Amino acid sequence: MDTPDSASRVFCGRFLSMVNTDDVNAIILAQKNMLDRFEKTNEMLLNFNNLSSVRLQQMSERFMHHTRTLVDMKRDLDSIFRRIRTLKGKLARQHPEAFSHIPEGSLLEDEDEDPVPPSITTTIATSEQSTGSCDTSPDTASPSFSPGFEDLSHIRPGSPAINGHSQTDDEEETREE
């Protein structure tokens, strides 16, 4: 039934004769070149992704460290301004004639002007606990440990101090004279 000149053989023979082997080889070579390029590109993207991940981790740690530093500085400044307000109040009570021309509202400033809500501090503390990251690089120091800053941790919050001397020290010196 199958003769050598059957229709299927003739069709396949003519179909194969239409395909140029040089063109097929050129297509295969082009596909191999593209595959090599895609593999190199993929490797470069993986390296870039890994490097970006490492840099993100480093920057996140530095950001958290700087955020903690800013929160500490804000807390210190709040304490300083509270002491200044207390000192102003005491001076206003001791020397009312010197403060008579200043309106009462400017002597006792409210803390309502705080632009940073307390929820941000809570968020920072929570994110620090979850990441557990800490930047210990020596090039960035906390302001409380820097040489130019005075350590005020030994002073009670209710006692204002000027240049390391409390107001009560000055009063005792004036009494002795």
UniProtKB/Swiss-Prot annotation:
This is KxDL motif-containing protein 1. Disulfide bonds: none annotated. Component of the BLOC-one-related complex (BORC) which is composed of BLOC1S1, BLOC1S2, BORCS5, BORCS6, BORCS7, BORCS8, KXD1 and SNAPIN. Associates with the BLOC-1 complex. Interacts with BLOC1S1. Interacts with DTNBP1/BLOC1S7 (via coiled-coil domain). GO terms for biological process: lysosome localization; vesicle-mediated transport. Its main location: membrane. The keyword Transmembrane helix does not apply. Coiled coil: none annotated. Residues 119-145 have a biased composition (Polar residues). The modification N-acetylmethionine is found at M1. It comes from Rattus norvegicus. Belongs to the KXD1 family. GO terms for cellular component: BLOC-1 complex; BORC complex; lysosomal membrane. Transmembrane segments: none annotated. It is found in: Lysosome membrane. InterPro entries: KXD1-like, KxDL_dom. The keyword Cell division does not apply. Keywords: Acetylation, Lysosome, Membrane. As part of the BORC complex may play a role in lysosomes movement and localization at the cell periphery. Associated with the cytosolic face of lysosomes, the BORC complex may recruit ARL8B and couple lysosomes to microtubule plus-end-directed kinesin motor. May also be involved in the biogenesis of lysosome-related organelles such as melanosomes. Residues 92-177 are annotated as: Disordered.
